[in-house]
Amino acid sequence: VVSQSGGVSHLVAYQALDEGVGLGKVIGLGNRCNVDFADLLPYLADDPETGCIILFMEGQDEPRPLFRALKEITPRKPVVAMKAGKYAVSLKAAQSHTGSLAGRSEIYEAALRQAGAVVVQEPQELLDVAKILSMVTPSAGRNVAVMSFQAGPGILLTDEVARQGLTMAAFSSKTQGDLNRLLPPLTIRTNPVDMAFARTEEAFEETVRLILSDENVDALVIFLLHHPFMTPGRIKAPVLRQKERSRKPILLCANSPRGLIEKEVEELEASGIPVYSFPDRTIRALAGLIRYGEVLRQTRGGAERMTR
């Protein structure tokens, strides 16, 4: 984490500790008297303990060295960036805080994207996107499949897919036919798939297999509330078996009262399945992964780091 604000660096670090996300280094630049973002990026890019770089910035007096460094580094290591000071009142506060030329956020964000950074809007999103980029191979496509055991959360996930500019995958005729035969009539068998009336581990695993095998699907998101029929512990083995057979990203959105699923979540994440607690956080993280995949697709030598 490299931040112009000591407070924000602590905010991100404390949340990372609370969520079990590893942090190698937390660096506060303040008013950047003699060290700036561009000075630190090459070091962090070559640091084997750093899987992803988080930047929080308020403004830059001379931004061109930063953008040059980002263009060189982002094909090798992901960078997630947030620019604060989006409104007139906060722009003034940013300038008085660090003495930097804050500038319009739209211009900064466009330049950051052009340089290969994944731009986010909130501190929580910094951490969520950095987590998935440290765990999952970037995806090459924007077609998302959603599975849930309740209709409402599936709709929330679908809303966020559209909000992030992603696409709900249209299953192939073969996949749709196989799902129609596998799942009972009351189940919603189109995307998003509602598994409410098919709560068996066998049906769950076969549904995951069919969806991941579909060439129209680039990533799979599974929503799960804690209940006796299907817990993160019960789906762990089926999901991990199918993960071994597919290079496509799989994300889990899971929630429960505190203390019930933490151990299972740790085990899933240790196996490369990122877990988030709310639909919006899950899809925003996936969108960040996909945007970094698009950065790699556009850079020379980046294609081999992608899922397909």
Where do the protein language model's features map onto the residues?
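Catalytic-core regions of core metabolic enzymes
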Residues: 2-308
